[in-house]
Amino acid sequence: MVIDSWQEPDVPRNIAIVSTDNGKGTTIFKADNPWQGYKVPDYSCGTIKADDDSTTLYYRMVKPVDFDPNKKYPTIVYVYGGPGVRNVEAGWHYNSRSWETYMAQKGYLLFILDNRGSSDRGREFEQVTFRHLGQEEMKDQMRGVEFLKSLPYVDADRLGVHGWSYGGFMTISLMTHYPDVFKVGVAGGPVIDWKWYEVMYGERYMDTPQDNPEGYKQTSLIEKAGNLKGRLQIIIGMNDDVVVPQHALMFLNACSEKGTQPDFYVYPGEGHNMMGHKSVHLHERITRYFDDYLK
């Protein structure tokens, strides 16, 4: 026999014993909802078409507590978008992050879309971004934005975007390629130019700068610094050895030369991800930025 452990969108944990002789399972544990009795957001999952008009993409939506379809809500697109990661799963609350729940309790609507290039959908799905990271991903994310704008309860004048690492790269990419769409963005540990990123990742998906100069030029955000219009906060750890501080600092230098005004916050001594009480401080800062400029 084997032990099978899994989640469902409305069940945090199931455990069953499955017979290897006949495949029949016996449930031995089904976890109760730990949030029973609390006011919680509505978590849902759906699909839209990718920019190629044929590929199905999955999204997660977290609606505010006490949701009223007659109101218009500030909406945050949470994005990662890169290879090797997916955000939307058929697990507990569709794999929603606790920060999404917190923001929904504060009156925001959250939208998370797994664009082409993300993981576990096959080689063709992931390889569409090869040698030009960020480009197809942005097109798919903008399909998500079009979908959001079609909903009567989404305030199209109060759209925000937030992501970390590859998601930080996507956040700045979206804000500089579509400057009239996003009012506020928070980019954490963002890649700015792939030639400065670690080669075991960058060259796997981009080839070398010598073999793919046009791809590196197209995906670099340095030349896009002058396009920035909305409020953008960039956050990094000063000891980040994954996306080294050179990325953010070079982008800030380009912004100063182009006359654009992003905000910048540094965690001294921290790496690519904040840990412990610094993580709490980080999420307070991200939340405050949206409260100040989007809500």
What kind of feature is each model-predicted range?
Residues 1-295:
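Serine-hydrolase catalytic core recognition
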